[in-house]
Amino acid sequence: MSVIELVYAREVLDSRGNPTVEVEVVLEDGAMGRAIVPSGASTGAFEAVELRDGDKGRYLGKGVETAVANVNEIIAPEIEGMDAFDQPAIDAIMIELDGTPNKGKLGANAILGVSMAVARAAADEIGLPLFQYLGGVNAKQLPVPMMNILNGGEHADNNVDVQEFMILPVGACCFKEGLRMGAEVFHSLKKVLGEKGLACGVGDEGGFAPNLGSNREALELIVEAITKAGYKPGEDVMLGLDVAATEMYNKETKKYVLAGEGKELTAAEMVALYEDWSNNFPIITIEDGLDEEDWDGWKLLTEKLGNKLQLVGDDLFVTNTERLEKGIENGVANSILVKVNQIGTITETLDAIEMAKRAGYTAVISHRSGETEDSTIADLAVAVNAGQIKTGAPSRTDRVAKYNQLLRIEEMVGEQARYCGLKSFYNLKK
């Protein structure tokens, strides 16, 4: 039977050593699902609320015992006895129990943990891998990995302003080869940095985090690493950026502060900077190029570069259909970053992806900087045929767990597996 018999949450640790919520859901016949909720460092103001205890005497105020109690004492009694296959109804009940627009009462970390665990338990009940349970028979496209191999901003303790410099192995024949290419470039970059006397320590997402003279230098180093690994920049491997511009935006001066370079730029100057970079480096995607509330700047960015670059809204959209709808109506961005904990349920996540695709936007499935061994997003990427996944460098087990799951999925799908490379950027006109 697919009836939920037990829902239980506990406090565990994420990749930064901070507490997070783990939930187990057990069905009547013993089928079980377990899920762990991730956590972000650079978070959008419009994200669903991650509930923390605030007790400075315990985990420096970052404990999640309140969220755990909300699962065990409030959510569990309401959904135990429900059918695990009725994911929309279960998610709707949790949203109703919370009663706030941002899940601020029970916590998105409490609600999401249950939502993911229910999906896993339902998949286990019928003996299907999660990607097939969520996506059906047509779930067979493996995503291009967007590998963050050089970290800056909020993800590293260095002077680099741009938060993430990514490589995308678009020239690979399959995911397995794409992962190999990315790993080889990653190791090549380590060698390049070492030869130049630069630090090879890694940031939150597994990428290197050296101090550099400029953001442009980071791009130059990665291009050098791609070449030394035996690949052609712009053909085998493309570049991507997550600027996380909200973190550098001064709301009083309405300028973007590139502290590492000692510059303050207007939105128009930021757009010109991106245009210059994209003309000189094989960049195909830029995430959060402007502040989450700079709609006029985003409009300009999209008009100038939206035909040649994937412009991804993360803080801009926060996996929220209301904000995404506003972006679609105003011709802002052309892609949405999908983070399950930004919205808080599997159902709402799938709704956001569906809305994006219907509007011709791409959807990029993403991790958070505070991750765990949970690999749900790997299955989700294939379930919705997203075509792209962003889950860090091929370094640190919390990142590699997702890549290893995708290797398994590619084997399971077998000859029907597709890896679309550049075709994953289906809305670009260049």
From Swiss-Prot:
Binding residue positions for (2R)-2-phosphoglycerate: Q163, K339, R368, S369, K390
Main subcellular location of this protein, as a coarse class: cytoplasm
UniProt-listed InterPro entries: Enolase, Enolase-like_C_sf, Enolase-like_N, Enolase_C, Enolase_CS, Enolase_N
GO cellular component terms attached to this protein's record: cell surface; extracellular region; phosphopyruvate hydratase complex
Enzyme class: lyase
Family: Belongs to the enolase family.
Record-linked NCBIfam families: eno (TIGR01060)
Binding site for Mg(2+): D242, E287, D314
Protein species of origin: Clostridioides difficile (strain 630)
Xref: SMART domains: Enolase_C, Enolase_N
Molecular function in Gene Ontology: magnesium ion binding; phosphopyruvate hydratase activity
Keyword terms: Cytoplasm, Glycolysis, Lyase, Magnesium, Metal-binding, Secreted
Record note on cofactor: Binds a second Mg(2+) ion via substrate during catalysis.
Domain of life: Bacteria
Residues annotated as catalytic: E205 (proton donor), K339 (proton acceptor)
Record-listed E.C. numbers: 4.2.1.11
Main function: Catalyzes the reversible conversion of 2-phosphoglycerate (2-PG) into phosphoenolpyruvate (PEP). It is essential for the degradation of carbohydrates via glycolysis.
Listed SUPFAM superfamilies: Enolase C-terminal domain-like (SSF51604), Enolase N-terminal domain-like (SSF54826)
Protein known as: Enolase
Catalytic reaction(s) noted: (2R)-2-phosphoglycerate = phosphoenolpyruvate + H2O
One Gene Ontology biological process: glycolytic process
